[in-house]
Swiss-Prot record:
GO terms for molecular function: 4 iron, 4 sulfur cluster binding; carbon-carbon lyase activity; zinc ion binding. Binds 1 [4Fe-4S] cluster per subunit. The cluster is coordinated with 3 cysteines and an exchangeable S-adenosyl-L-methionine. The keyword DNA damage does not apply. One of its GO terms (cellular component) is cytosol. Its cofactor is [4Fe-4S] cluster. Its EC number is 4.1.99.17. The gene is thiC. Catalyzes the synthesis of the hydroxymethylpyrimidine phosphate (HMP-P) moiety of thiamine from aminoimidazole ribotide (AIR) in a radical S-adenosyl-L-methionine (SAM)-dependent reaction. HAMAP family: ThiC. This is Phosphomethylpyrimidine synthase. It comes from Prochlorococcus marinus (strain SARG / CCMP1375 / SS120). Substrate binds at residues 82, 111, 141, 177, 197-199, 238-241, 277, 304.
Length: 468
């Protein structure tokens, strides 16, 4: 039997089954207990953080094969991987391949951002059924696809219908672009890259055509009613995130952020879980401000950022430009990092791009956990360092974030098994590796005794005499 089947059986049909609902009534759910063990934290702390809104456990009651996880400042920094088909590329099997690779290389959640080229319901259902990690979606994509791309035919009910369909299928969190208001649109004037959010762009077009307020904002309470029946979490979308350094931290971005804070509180009144999405493209000196501002405006709801990229001049290497910003954002308190692949701004990622992007972001998240002094975060680093000093090559590979890549690079020049016991690699060769110089603690203790008995002046004189 699938693990969560018995957990959720008694909840089905209730008006509110969210983790926040139970936490606020001091009920520790099976999901909270599972997360507590995973994070090595007390169950009571998990319950308190979920109740407070500083942590979410995205766990739709219809996603039965899910292994619950937590997103929040009290837990380890998480990484999301985006996959999804486009009208020009990919199919269901390709997306499942990307999913399996993402999970293999440590994705904590996966978003299906399919926009076309496949049956969207088919690919989403296949991904959810195959995924042990939470699945997120952006429902406005399918809402537009359902009316064949015709903004003028897209109604408020179309949005709500698709949102509930995703909940029924088992989606654990949905990006809802409810913070973009019609009065925010003029603030985009003067930007270099305008609106770069696909979902935000769709809603901006809808508002410009209909001259009405954002339907996801006006119907927000209706969406909350849907979400709490399935325990689907909000990922409040940042439609006005900056798409370049020039636009970072501008009036448009901050106006939307203020609205996202208000929506966070509205969702919490329904006991619905919320995280808030963030930029984007941000210079390094503005990253701390962006994280602190989100925490202030959104009352410490978990922050989920895309990057941010710290420079705009490296197409093909944006997994690197963004991992730099992601590590900093994680250090300052961001709860989840959305990966960027080398294909960002250039094309649809293939499976190898997924691997490259994910490893870059696992590095960033791990570095953030170390910088935040999270308990045990550095244990694996220390263990690998001991293996490195002992020339235990197989142990080094095993402890690596990407064992296959580490082994592959080592074996390019020294492939034979005998070199797995060698006290060198091809960088220094057999005679020049500094780690071969095994200076023991006993050696250093003896040196300390000599230094203390002779004194600095005598040691320096001895050195000069030797040089002469």
């Amino acid at each position: 039997m699938i693990m969560r089947t018995s957990w959720v059986a008694s909840r089905k049909g209730q008006s509110n089954v969210s983790q926040m609902y139970f936490a606020r009534r001091e009920v520790i759910t099976e999901e909270m207990s599972f997360v507590a063990k995973k994070e090595n934290l007390p169950e009571s702390l998990i319950m308190e953080e979920v109740a407070r809104g500083r942590m979410i456990i995205p766990a739709n009651i219809n996603h039965l094969n899910l292994e619950p996880m937590a997103i929040g400042i009290a837990s380890s920094c998480k990484v999301n991987a985006n996959i999804g088909a486009s009208p020009n590329a990919s199919d269901v099997n390709e997306e499942l391949k990307k999913l399996h690779l993402a999970v293999k290389y440590g994705a904590d959640t996966v978003m299906d951002l399919s926009t076309g080229g496949v049956n969207l319901d088919e690919v989403r259902t296949a991904i959810i059924q195959a995924s042990p990690v939470p699945i997120g979606t952006v429902p406005v994509y399918q809402a537009l696809e359902s009316v064949h791309g015709s903004i003028e035919k897209l109604s408020e009910e179309d949005f709500l219908h698709i949102i509930e369909k995703h909940c029924q299928q088992g989606v654990d969190y949905q990006t809802i672009h409810a913070g973009l208001l019609i009065e925010h649109l003029p603030k985009v004037k003067g930007r270099l890259t305008g609106i770069v959010s696909r979902g935000g762009g769709i809603l901006a077009q809808w508002m410009l055509y209909h001259h009405k307020q954002n339907p996801l904002f006006t119907r927000f309470d209706d969406i909350c009613e849907i979400f709490k029946r399935y325990d689907c979490s909000f990922s409040l979308g940042d439609s006005l995130r900056p798409g370049c350094l020039h636009d970072a931290s501008d009036e448009a971005q901050l106006a939307e952020l203020k609205t996202l804070g208000e929506l966070t509180q509205r969702a919490w009144k329904h006991d619905v879980q919320v995280m808030v999405e963030g930029p984007g493209h941000v210079p390094m000196d503005q990253i701390e401000f962006n994280v602190r501002k989100q925490m202030e405006d959104c009352l410490e709801a978990p922050f989920y950022v895309l990057g941010p990229l710290v420079t705009d001049i490296a197409p093909g290497y944006d997994h690197i430009t963004s991992a730099i910003g992601a590590a900093m954002a994680g250090w300052y308190g961001t709860a989840m990092l959305c990966y960027v692949t080398p294909k960002e701004h250039l094309g649809l990622p293939n499976p190898e791009d997924v691997r490259e992007g994910l490893i870059a972001y696992k590095i960033a998240a791990h570095a953030a956990d170390i910088a935040r002094h999270r308990s045990g975060a550095r244990d694996r680093d220390d263990e690998l360092s001991r293996a490195r000093y002992a020339f235990d090559w197989n142990k080094q590979f095993e402890l690596s974030l990407d064992p296959e890549r580490a082994r592959e690079y080592h074996d390019e020049t020294l492939p034979a098994d005998i070199y797995k016991q060698a006290e060198f690699c091809s960088m220094c060769g057999p005679k020049h590796c500094p780690m071969q110089t095994k200076i023991t603690d006993k050696d250093l203790e003896n040196l300390e005794s000599i230094l203390s008995s002779k004194g600095a002046k005598e040691i320096n004189t001895m050195k000069l005499d030797k040089e002469v």
